[in-house]
Regions:
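GGW-centered surface loops in extracellular recognition modules
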Residues: 2-12
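Functional-site microenvironments in short loops/helix caps that host divalent-cation chemistry
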Residues: 12-13, 17-19, 23-25, 72-172
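A secondary-structure boundary/capping signal
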Residues: 14, 39-41, 46, 60, ...
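Cytochrome P450 core scaffold surrounding the K-helix E-X-X-R motif
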Residues: 20-31, 57
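Short active-site loop at a secondary-structure junction
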Residues: 37-50, 54, 123-134
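Short capping motifs at secondary-structure boundaries
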Residues: 43, 58-67, 146-147
Length: 172
């Protein structure tokens, strides 16, 4: 196995306390409440998402097979795809209750973002886009290969919020 590719776009964030979670009731079962104060030590996090090209290097180096490419029960592997990316004549499939914009698509994985027929070709302009259809297990394997670790939920929320204490969106 070749050496891992170091993540070069890490930024250091000073720790501190912040209010984590929210009590918005748009999705009551999302587990984001109650709001609680959390203290974090300083940590490093990538300033960008992992790209298709970076993930391709990981797969080429390790022969890794993602969760979306596997099937535990012999049925065809699948993943959820945003319904707005599917053709109008796409056959009805299982969705997610309360989030009907997600549709189950057989054959959707990181290399086929919208399912069969959407393969990332060698000359594709999406190699620098964020990789999709990646489970926590897939992300953890990539991070270990790259010599990093995944951020904790608190670190992720702290980084994503920036200085926007308890604001749901950047504009308020």
């Amino acid at each position: 196995m070749a050496e891992s590719v170091p993540i070069t776009n890490l930024i250091e964030l000073s720790g501190g306390s912040f209010l984590m979670g929210n009590e918005q009731d748009a999705y009551p079962a999302d587990g984001e409440g109650p709001v609680r104060e959390v203290f974090l030590s300083s940590f490093a996090i990538s300033s960008t998402a992992v790209t298709n090209e970076e993930f391709k290097a990981f797969v080429a180096d390790t022969n890794y097979v993602t969760t979306a490419e596997q099937s535990e029960d012999g049925s065809p592997p699948w993943s959820f795809v945003f319904a707005g990316l599917l053709p109008d004549d796409f056959p009805p499939t299982r969705g997610v209750l309360g989030a009907e914009w997600w549709r189950q698509v057989e054959g959707a994985d990181w290399l086929h973002p919208e399912g069969p027929g959407s393969e990332l070709e060698p000359e594709c302009s999406r190699w620098n886009h964020p990789v999709v259809h990646i489970s926590w297990f897939d992300a953890k394997a990539f991070a270990e290969w790259a010599g990093c670790r995944l951020p904790t939920e608190a670190e992720w929320e702290f980084a994503a919020r920036g200085d926007l204490n308890q604001k749901r969106f950047p504009w308020g």
